[in-house]
Amino acid sequence: MPLDDRKKKILYAVITDYIMTAEPIGSRTIAKKYNIGLSSATIRNEMADLEEMGYLEQPHTSAGRIPSDKGYRFYVDSILRNYINNDPPISYNTREEIIAEFDEIVKKYARILANITHHTTVAKMPKLNPDRIKKIQLIPVASNKMIFLVVTDTGIVKNYLLNLCQNVDRTIFEFLNNLLNEKIAGKSEKDIFEFLQQDLRQMLGEMAFIADELINTILLSLKQLQETDIYADGTSHILDFPEYKDLGKAKNFFNLLDNKSLLNEVLEPEVDFIDVRIGSENKFEEMKDLSVIKTTYKINGRVVGTIGIIGPTRMDYRKLISEINVMTKELSNLLSSIYNDEI
């Protein structure tokens, strides 16, 4: 049965008050604090109906009501409908004019989001196949040092510093750049391994002494490109919530953040917009008391990762949805502007 306007107002009042106080709320409090225009008795009857319909819960017989997961879901869906139709403008000045390591930019935005929201944030970095490597560049920084730069077809950059056992003439770098791009960029993992194991040393000739460093660095870059990295920030914010004053419950939360495989599944994008999972909607038992707000970030419209906020079900969904929406749009714009062109 759909909720009428009166029930909606009462449900929103209960949720708003509970988010602020973490205490069950009664009909008299709603009548006094919120301009609903109904008597305490009428509100009490409506709250009983909302409880029977599954939108509210009564933790103790003598206490007021608190929102259920179903109640939060109704509230969140109404917020998301507004955001689909009315995207807020980007307002945070967090842009940098330098090209930075991709992962570090994402981590910075996750850190900013944690500081703004006072919640724990988690970020998922992209997992890529070797044949997504678009370009390799060796940049000399000294006679015995070079930067090994990998650029993927989405523009994501990885860089590594190579310390060589001997000095290298700078004229060799053009040869190396051409060779590595010909043999690695756009090639399958099998072809790359065959080149490294069978051909590289021979092709380097008298420069074979740098083969070990190159092979180790290339293998490391391939390994890291295929790994899904999970980053968490603002982990201590959970202790600010009364629900997590219990040390056992707090410990379980920190153990959850250490479970990277679980977080990897939690952050797997399921919709191409803001996705909210509330309490029992989460498929993992460890997250039945938590809510997750997550959304993807993109490079030129292509999804490359996910950022999420994790906290108690009693969270300010309207504020947090707004914050994560703005921050991921800003992050996507920044990444697209930095990695739009070839380096």
Curated annotation (Swiss-Prot):
GO molecular function: DNA binding
UniProt xrefs under InterPro entries: GAF-like_dom_sf, HrcA, HrcA_C, WH-like_DNA-bd_sf, WH_DNA-bd_sf, WHTH_transcript_rep_HrcA_IDD
The protein's name in its UniProt record: Heat-inducible transcription repressor HrcA
Species whose genome carries this gene: Thermoanaerobacter pseudethanolicus (strain ATCC 33223 / 39E)
UniProt-listed HAMAP family: HrcA
Pfam family, one: HrcA
Gene Ontology annotations of biological process type: negative regulation of DNA-templated transcription
Organism classification: Bacteria, Bacillati, Bacillota, Clostridia, Thermoanaerobacterales
Function: Negative regulator of class I heat shock genes (grpE-dnaK-dnaJ and groELS operons). Prevents heat-shock induction of these operons.
UniProt keyword terms in alphabetical order: Repressor, Stress response, Transcription, Transcription regulation
Family: Belongs to the HrcA family.
